[in-house]
Amino acid sequence: MAHSAPLGLLEQGCPIQVEHDRKRRQFTVRLNGCHDRAVLLYEYVGKRIVDLQHTEVPDAYRGRGIAKHLAKAALDFVVEEDLKAHLTCWYIQKYVKENPLPQYLEHLQP
């Protein structure tokens, strides 16, 4: 089941909505209607461990904070589900370094 939460604004006052597709193991933000999308991919690598693998935002939408919303949604999911996270994605590593919230740090895979 997909879950979405409005976060920030995209274009012309359109809210950024991060959708979580648990079946496909991805978080997405639809851009420009349905034509483009930003995505954060993850995989389960253990019973309670997820690997946040890759974040991708189309070139035309970079620098607008979209990846930040994907990172926050993924880390909030890890915390809410009481999982451990392995951070393969360089952007997620950067996000955690810039936002060292205790609830995120407690859920990182050593």
UniProtKB/Swiss-Prot annotation:
In terms of PROSITE patterns, this protein maps to:
GNAT_YJDJ (PS51729)
**Which ranges carry the N-acetyltransferase domain?**
19-109
The UniProt entry, under InterPro entries, shows:
Acyl_CoA_acyltransferase, Gcn5-rel_NAT, GNAT_YJDJ
**Where are the disulfide bridges?**
none
Coiled-coil regions listed in the entry? none
By sequence similarity, the record places it as follows: Belongs to the NATD1 family.
Report the protein name in the record: Protein NATD1
From which organism does this entry originate?
Gallus gallus (Chicken)
Task: Provide the taxonomic classification.
Answer: Eukaryota, Metazoa, Chordata, Craniata, Vertebrata
